Amino acid sequence: MKIRNSLKSLKGRHRDNRVIRRRGRTYIINKTVRRFKARQG
């Protein structure tokens, strides 16, 4: 999982990317290509 300051550019890298908010953190998850996972930090 990558940890990035800004997730806006990562969101557009694949059409299946989803922005999810869990426990106050913002994540990008992708069910089909799992290497696109990221967390804002």
Curated annotation (Swiss-Prot):
Belongs to the bacterial ribosomal protein bL36 family. The gene is rpmJ. Keywords: Ribonucleoprotein, Ribosomal protein. This is Large ribosomal subunit protein bL36. The lineage of its organism: Bacteria, Pseudomonadati, Pseudomonadota, Alphaproteobacteria, Sphingomonadales. GO terms for cellular component: ribonucleoprotein complex; ribosome. It comes from the Bacteria. It comes from Zymomonas mobilis subsp. mobilis (strain ATCC 31821 / ZM4 / CP4). GO terms for biological process: translation. GO terms for molecular function: structural constituent of ribosome.
